[in-house]
Amino acid sequence: MSTPSPFGHDLQREEPPYTILKAPVTADPSAPRRYPWAWQKYLDACANHWMPQEISMERDIALWKSPHGLSEDERRIVKRNLGFFTTADSLAANNIVLGTYRQIRAPECRQYLIRQAFEEAIHTHSYQYIVESLGLDEGEVFNAYREIPSIRDKDAFLLPHIEVLAAPRFQTGTPETDAALLRSLIVFAAMMEGLFFYVGFAQILALWRQNKMVGAAEQYQYILRDESMHCNFGIDLANQIKIENPHLWNPDFQAEILQLMRTAVDLECAYATDTMPRGVLGLNANQMHKYVIYIANRRCAQLDLPEIHPGTPNPFPWMSEMLDLKKEKNFFETRVTEYRTGGGLNWD
């Protein structure tokens, strides 16, 4: 931007750097988009819109009510999953609304974060819909984060990384606070949404492969699709911040992230053992542990970090198709009702 000069030429005033953390906050939808990848992710997320009540739970209800429909081990998996996921997506939404959104200044990134928070609400709605459809004890399911150690420990791992950003006086702009934001982004993208959900996804989709709990599993497929996008967006956001602030990505910080990832792996392996103490659905806890490590290695690679256990193979190759967005089928072909934007509104 130029400033008039009495000497007959304009002085050049240097603009402040435009970065994820220093972009001018604007409500102008025509503002230049410096990060087209973020805007594209927003458009992709909007194209994947779904609502839980569009999916029939009729077969699931009949199976759950049948005394011989599911084994006790299978029922344990379903209830443990719902117990963790109902809390987890609420934590994810709180992290966005109370923390991350306030600190990320690029408008196209904020646009995606708003969409992501809405999707977290849809996921919570989905778990409630499943719980109500099956007639489960809501107190048992919704209090699992207090009463089940393997769930409580995962939540306890996440909470400090929400609280630091949600503190009223927290503000980026120093190396310490910028690092705190980057750390929180990585924990939620790569460890929560990118790791803590995947034992549950594999278990419920293993039921689906045996034609069990098909309505719940279809919702989990939609959620898997959403969470894969959340994970990838969060990691892309973290990587962009690393590029713009290379001093943050120093050896000590990288070592800290690797240690957090190892802790997250231990917590998810403990959860896998708790949810399936015996082999079920052709799965066992040892396979799940290898799967957790395989997923953790993928997240490390996305962050340009060394794998925690190099070369660990994927014990569930049938999950690969669902983890790769480019190969996912169009789940929306199986909806019980055609989605119409605003179709349920009456303006009279």
What does each model-identified segment do?
Residues S2-D348:
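Non-heme di-metal
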